[in-house]
Structure formats: C-alpha cells, structure tokens
Amino acid sequence: MDQEVEKIIEHIEKGENFLLSGGAGSGKTYSLVQVIREVIARHPSSKIACMTYTNASVHEIERRVDHPNLNVSTIHDFLWDNIKNFQREIKVTLIEMLNTDDSGISLNGYDGEVPSDFFDKDRESDFAIQYKEYIKLQDGIISHDEVLKLSERMFFKYPKIVSFVKSRYPFVFIDEYQDTNPLIVKILLEYFLKVTKKCVVGFFGDSMQAIYDDGVGDIDSYLITDDNPDGCVYEVQKKQNRRCPQAVITLANSLRLDSLRQEPSTDVKAPNMTEDGHVKEGSISFYYSDEDKTDTLKEKLTNEFGWDFSDTENTKELRLTHNLIANEAGFETLMQIHDSDKIIEYGKRLRDYAKTKGVLDDIKPLILEESIKVLSSKFPDDKKKWSPTKAQLNFIEANSDLYAEALNMPFESIACYVDKDQLLDDKSEEDAGKGTGSKLSPLNHHLHKIEHCIQLYLDNDFNEFMRSTSIKQITRASQKKELREGIDRIVSSYNDMTISEVIDLADSLEICVKDDKVNSYIENNPYLWKRIKEVSYKEARNVYDYRMGNKPFSTQHKTKGLEYNNVLVILKSNWSNYDFASLFYDNGKKYSIVERTKKLFYVCCTRAKENLVVYYPSASDAIINGAKMLFGESNIYTI
C-alpha cells in the first residue's frame, strides 16, 4: 500500500474528511482504487459512493474494483439516484425554482406564475418527475443542468435528504474534484456538516489542472491548516510522477502555484523509468521565430527527429485557437457562423450604438429592418457610426438573399451573443457534452448527442446506446430494421444530408428527440438556425471527431488526463482570457489571467512522456529571455 494511501486510511478511520493532491502523472486514480479496496476490506458491510467526471471513468473504476457495496457513477447520476424517491419534495422545489427569476430553470412558453399543482393537476396519480438526456419540463422531464441546481436546493432545504444519503453511504469519494461544480462541494462540505450522522468525504485531484472556469478549482478554504484550524478537510500530497521524464518534471515544478513539488517515481516499473532503474531524462525545447513558421517547425520535427503527426496516439499538436484548426479539421462553415458572421457583427454594431444613445430598449422589440429605420430617423447625421463596416457590407452584398431574410427577423435574434465556444467548448467531450457548465449551445449539444449515439450503435454498444437515446425499448423486428436503415442512411449519406435533415431523422427515430432547449434555441435564434440548418452534416461529424480527439491536433484544453510520447505546444492566441507572454515575464497582466494561463500550460507540458517542444511565433526579447530561464539556454532555438 502506498504511504499516501496509508495516511488517507488513518484519516478515514478517525472519521476525517481528506483531500489527496497529486500532480500530473502521479497515479491518483490508482490511489483511489487502493483506498476503495482497503475501505471494503475494513468495512465490508458499508456502502461506498464514488463520483467521477465521465462515464468512461466510471467504467474504468468498476473494471478495477468489482464489489456489490461500491456504487460508481457520474455526479449527476449520484444526485438523481438519491433524490428521485422524494417526489413530493422535488415537485415543490421545482415549482419554487420555476417561479424564481435567478434559479436558472424556466418553463419554455409558459407566461405567469407556475401554479403549485402544475405537476399534479390533470395527470396520473403516480406521475413522477423523470431525469433523462433531454429536458421537457411540461412533461416533467429534467436534464443534467436541472438535476444539479435542483439537488443543491433540496439538500439545503431538506436535512432529511442529507441524513438519508449519509446513512446510505458512510463513505463518499470524488475523483477529479477540481472540475466539480462548486454546488457539489457546498453540498458535501457544508450541508453534510449540518447533519450529525457519520460520513467521510474524500477528494482526489490536482488544483493545477483546474482549467475550466465553472469548476471549483480548489478547496483551499476548507483545508485544515495552521492559519485555518477550523477547516474540515485534511490534505495528503502525492509527490511522485510516473509519467514524465526528468526534464519535464523540472519544468512543471517551476510552473506550479502551490506547495506541491513532484519528484520521479521510486517504482522501477513506472513508465518514466529506464531498464536500469533510473528516471528518463527526456527533452524539452523552446522554438521561436519572427513570424509564424509552424509548418517549417513540423517539417523539422518530422524529418530530423522522426515525429509522425499522423500517429495521434503518440504525437500531438496542441493549440489554443480553434480558428487555426477549423479549415484542416473540416468545419470551416460552422466556425465562420459562430465566430465571424458579418450580419451578426452588424447587429451587434447596431446594438452597441443604440445603447450609447439610450434607445436600445426602443429597438429591441422590432425586426431588424424597423430598428435600422429608427436609427436612421433619429440619428441621420451619425449614419457612419451605425452603418455596416466595409467587410460587413461586402458580405451583405454577396449574400443579399440571406440579408433580405434577416431584415424580417427580430432584432435581438440578429444582435445576439454567439462565439466559437458555443460550437467547440471542450468541457466533457468524453461524456458526449454531458457535463454541467458546458458552453455548447443547445443546438450543438444536440448534434453532439446525435453523433455520440450513432457511434455507440456502430460500435455495437447497444446497452449504452439504449441508455443514451430516447428509445424506450425495441420490441418489433420492423422497428429494429427502421432504426438500422435510418442510421445507415446518416452514415452513408452525411456528405449529402443537411444538419436539419439529420436532426429531423434522429428525432423521428427517437435516437435523439428535440427537447425544450433545442426547440427554444431554434425559436429564439431564427437567423442562426437558418444558417446552421443548411450546412452539410459532414461538418457536424467533423466537429464531433475534433472534440473527441480523433484528429492529429487539439486545443490545449482537450488533453487533460492524456499522454503522448511527443508533444508540440503552439503558444499563439488572441483570447483575452489567456496571455502566454506572462509565462515568461511579468507584463502586468491580472493575476487571474496569469493563473489561468499557467495552469493550461502546465497541463500541456505534462502530457509529454518523452519529448516536449514549445513554439512561440513572433516572440519578443523579453519572452526569449524568460524562456531561457524556464527551459535552459541550451534548449532555446530559432527557426
């Protein structure tokens, strides 16, 4: 048993909550499995709940530990499993939330206050709220986001539910805690403490790998320290690194923002050890240039060092900016719609101008054409300030039919907020976009679910396919034939079918029904829907493949938990949330930006099992000097 596991068991036997902090490649999941096995051995009649971030992680832990008293599930499944039998309380709480403006839950198409008997009146006596892959509140069906918000409200409001869960599970463990929604942490470390029943809560993860804005990031405020003796969680650090070579470990340690400093594994069988029992040295290199020479660098790595960028299991190219990848990955049109549609840009230009003039509320209820007439009438001398820019005008003239339709659409649907995160947000791609907090639009989330279900069917994973679809059961041979023919049609004709056609077919076959969120999105975004629905479904498939990592390139967000022999990191971005120059010198950026950037860079660097190359196009002298400090002067190269 690892010494870190021994310390954790000591805390468990004392009834103390704990956190296992382990850096990249430390074997945190292995420690989690060891802890579970030891708890089972010591408390064979007690049930253990283990929450993980994705279904893939659920299956991995279940494969390693097979015991009837172990319940491994995603966070959402755990929450629903524990509140689903409190139907009266669910209905009461849902009604309260539907009638509260800031609850994050609303009833599509319903005006006024929702009556207290909404989920009981004119329904069967045994009518129950259900949790599914889609939301239809009118029918009492909630989805992932609603389960999280509903659960938090119910655990706060009903101590008896807390008591029920603590009695049911004396041990609750959370894997990858840093990505967990803060509401979950509040339930486990605040609401749980208000009920005296014994229950040990354990967290496993790494705050340096907290790269999603909606995750808790860390639980430092709950840790028991000299400065915080009233905390409720004991920290145990796991310092060994079993993945990375020494050169990468040294670099990664210089990036960490906490007290944890990793060291090579002492296990001679660890992947980063040589045959004679020494840690691999590996290599780190920093390349820079006066202009973008990415292709030149990739040719050099291929020809001189034998890198094979088509071998996605061993070699990975990481970029931050999706735009650099869209053309190569085959979703250029969808990217253009979400990131640089000129009619939407014109709508935003009108909105911003109207706001400065105090007339935004006057034009919000109008169609686009009428809103332009209002501005033209009120501010004729300011026409240059609200007229289309040259680029916007060129697009409008080249797409006159599209613009003519847009003129008759609601102004707010044109001047809407849309960005590439709504197409490509990297949150929870393993779990088909299931994670709460994903920035995917409801429409793109729906497209991802369709392709996910198709892939399950093609992989002959019929149990997971049935669980993921809206199909209740297949009882007739004709039904099975219709389903197979429908999926075969999509797979064989995706080049010729539009996104709209595939959505309708998947809905009719109940592979993926159009729920409240999708219908609301289509209704409230007629211009975006007009543009997206006519795009080839092939682009949606390419987006899915890209988000799932089935391409030779990725954004840096996508690789947490993965590892490759060769890693190329390209530090090129125009995102305001990150500033790569701040990695190399103090340029006065806000700490939140510096912290976010360092964590993302840390995740990228620690993917490398052998060789790490970092490339910075158009690097300044200050960046180059900072790189020499981080990488060592002998590891700096120009192209």
Per-range role (PLM):
Residues 1-639:
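The feature marks helicase ATPase cores and/or their adjacent C-terminal helical subdomains
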